[in-house]
């Protein structure tokens, strides 16, 4: 067996191994980190039909995207930071990741029973800026989302604003920091107005006593969504990701309703 033959065989084997390594190397996933409150977060089956909009949102991406829903009920920007929920996310961020940021419900809660979560407008602004800057420092992409509107109508059937001050702050921060923002507050309210009072109730945790075994006393919740409402909010977010021309939009897929 001559040396040239052996040399060619070695080259062929090396090339084959290189190709195999290239083929089996796992593709780096785009990670989407979701931080926010109870309107976004995950709920277990024992809470059905209560659904955060982050739950249906996560299924509308192809296999190259990994959605990490880190939202938690009752959290404001302040408590999300003070409870050391943000720092591990910030430390884990990699280039090309996304951070979807929706806070406001609990930040604005001044009632005595919610004083543990209240955040002053100035601190709210500074906390949003911190999320943005730390995300950008990792060459990841922050996306602000104004707090989804609660269901509230006046006696004439007009859908009312429920987050005026904190939504305005977030929109201003987005403009000043030059980051994309999805105005879910306005878009959800526009949806309620289009649907009207009675149809809007079908989006929320509105249950009569005895209607659902998990909620024997019923529920008159104007803040949290059922499966239908969560899906509607997720559809708004996905549509805006496309309209903002985020690279993430290329990985959105159509899922048929079950």
Question: For the regions a protein language model found, what residue spans apply to each?
Answer:
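Alpha-helical cap/lid subdomain in secreted, periplasmic
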Residues: 3-5, 27, 85-231, 235-254
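Extended, non-catalytic scaffold segments that flank or surround catalytic motifs
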Residues: 15-18, 32, 154-155, 162
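Short, solvent-exposed mixed-charge patches
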Residues: 256-258
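A generic, residue-level signal for flexible/boundary positions that often mark functional hotspots
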Residues: 18, 34, 217-219
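Acidic/histidine-rich helix-loop elements
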Residues: 41-50, 71-80, 111-120
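Serine-esterase "nucleophile elbow" of acetyl-processing enzymes
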Residues: 23-72, 87-99
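Bacterial Sec-dependent signal peptides at the C-terminal "C-region" and cleavage site
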Residues: 7-10, 14, 18-29
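Glycine-centered flexibility sites
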Residues: 36, 52, 71-74, 104, ...
């Amino acid at each position: 067996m001559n040396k040239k033959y052996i040399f060619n065989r070695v080259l062929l084997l090396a090339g084959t191994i290189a190709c195999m390594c290239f083929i089996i190397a796992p593709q780096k996933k785009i990670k989407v980190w979701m931080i926010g409150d109870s309107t976004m977060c995950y709920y277990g089956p024992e809470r059905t039909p209560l659904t955060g909009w982050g739950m249906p949102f996560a299924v509308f991406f192809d296999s190259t995207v990994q959605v990490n829903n880190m939202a938690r009920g009752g959290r404001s920007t302040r408590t999300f930071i003070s409870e050391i929920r943000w720092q591990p996310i910030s430390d884990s961020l990699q280039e090309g990741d996304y951070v979807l940021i929706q806070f406001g419900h609990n930040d604005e809660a001044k009632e005595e029973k919610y004083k543990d979560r209240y955040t002053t407008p100035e601190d709210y602004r500074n906390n949003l800026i911190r999320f943005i800057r730390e995300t950008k420092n990792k060459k990841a992409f922050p996306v602000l989302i104004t707090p989804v509107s609660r269901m509230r109508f006046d006696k004439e059937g007009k859908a009312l604003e429920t987050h005026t001050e904190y939504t305005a702050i977030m929109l201003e921060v987005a403009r000043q920091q030059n980051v994309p923002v999805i105005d879910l507050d306005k878009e959800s309210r526009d949806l309620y107005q289009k649907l009207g009072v009675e149809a809007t109730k079908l989006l929320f945790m509105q249950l009569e006593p005895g209607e659902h075994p998990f909620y024997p006393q019923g529920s008159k919740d104007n803040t949290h969504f059922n499966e239908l409402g969560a899906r509607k909010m997720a559809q708004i977010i996905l549509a805006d990701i496309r309209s903002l021309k985020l690279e993430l939009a290329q990985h959105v897929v159509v899922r048929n309703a079950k």
